[in-house]
A protein has these predicted regions:
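Basic helix-extension-helix modules of the SAP/HeH family
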Residues: 3-6, 10-207
């Protein structure tokens, strides 16, 4: 997938020799993988010199699906995007979740940027504040409800606090109460993930 670094580019802090080394390393790949401007290029190039397995494999940059976005922009979905969909499928990925380094170093994608594109493509959606109440602690829910004039909450279970929050808090109050949101797959996102079981099977699993 095409990537954006918000104006920053890894080449800005690299020497001419390092740029040439990276371009030579990936000369037979479809495109250059994403490289964070914060990466220690000298150390990484030294690791690659010892073991080529430290480089992004050629297959990881090959598109597995093309999706047209608004304005005719073509979104090229690669293996890293499938793994990102897989991570989201566990329903534990939130707007505060961190992205493992393998997205950059193994799959060659800027995961944060790609996630925004997957949302724009309708493959992933950000849950509403009301649907993300499970991410809020019980004490925080109690405070929000008390601030809204709801009393008698002592000993109330979290599930009931969530229900009361949906019933008594205005949309604006919910927005303030739920700073973190969950990501979830849409039907299209689930279908795309299910169409590529081999990608998930190839991904290293802990344990």
């Amino acid at each position: 997938m095409a990537v954006s670094t918000g104006g920053a580019d890894w080449r800005d802090g690299a020497t001419a020799e390092q740029v040439a080394a990276v371009e030579h390393l990936y000369r037979n790949h479809r495109s250059l993988p994403y490289i964070s401007p914060e990466r220690d290029l000298a150390a990484w190039l030294e690791e690659v010199g010892v073991s080529s397995s430290k480089a992004v494999p050629k297959w990881a940059l090959e598109p597995v699906a093309d999706i047209e976005l608004y304005g005719g922009y073509l979104l090229e979905v690669t293996a890293g995007d499938i793994i990102l969909l897989w991570r989201i499928s566990f329903d534990t990925f939130t707007t505060q979740s961190w992205f493992p380094k393998y997205f950059e170093y193994t799959y060659g994608i800027d995961a944060a940027f790609d996630l925004r594109m997957l949302v724009e493509a309708g493959l992933v959606e950000i849950e509403s504040a009301a649907d993300s109440l499970d991410l809020v602690t019980a004490p925080a829910l109690c405070k929000a409800l008390k601030d809204a004039g709801v009393n008698g909450l002592s000993g109330t279970k979290k599930a009931d606090l969530m229900r009361l929050a949906r019933e008594h808090l205005s949309p604006a109050q919910l927005e303030d109460t739920v700073p973190v949101r969950s990501y979830m797959l849409t039907t299209a996102g689930r279908a795309l993930l299910d169409a590529h079981p081999g990608m998930v099977a190839k991904h290293p699993k802990k344990g």
